[in-house]
């Protein structure tokens, strides 16, 4: 958006929550058109890994957060919008998980505000961070967040160096071949 403010470009296109967050931060931007549906963002694990249960647990907790309004609170905290997404679940929402290990390593990308970014106190924060922390608490497991960058986060999960990824990752057919969402 710096190119826009200096006049180097006349318009920019980005994900709606990214622009809404920039507006909320005081940037002189506006949204002047209807957006295009480009898919959805998701939490993922390596297909065939022993941590595929994390997707089910994530979705169960997400459904409960949708039901109790806490998902809406997180989204509104970081953007000006609300969500109408309906997570799918395979078991009852709110059912506690039985962790397979004491701590799960979740890889992310800290350069994608408002989803994940470093604040002025050098703390990782944003929609994805609030979401994964709330889900870990709801499901009764510990997490360790790493922020190696988007491509490195994908590689870390594929190599088994991280158990899952939450990094504003869009769900595509190609990614479905490698990841479960």
Outline where the language-model segments fall.
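Periplasmic-binding protein-like
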Residues: 16, 20-60, 110
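Immediate post-signal peptide segment of exported/extracytoplasmic ligand-binding proteins
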Residues: 83-124, 137
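Acidic, polar ligand-binding/catalytic clefts
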Residues: 28-37, 48, 129, 137, ...
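Short catalytic helix/loop segments, enriched in acidic residues and glycine
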Residues: 124-134
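Ligand-binding clefts/hinges and TM-proximal coupling segments of bilobed small-molecule sensing domains
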Residues: 26-33, 59-100
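Hydrophobic residues within well-ordered alpha-helices
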Residues: 4-5, 43, 58, 135, ...
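Short, Asp-centered acidic motifs that coordinate Mg2+ and/or phosphate
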Residues: 10-11, 30, 42, 105, ...
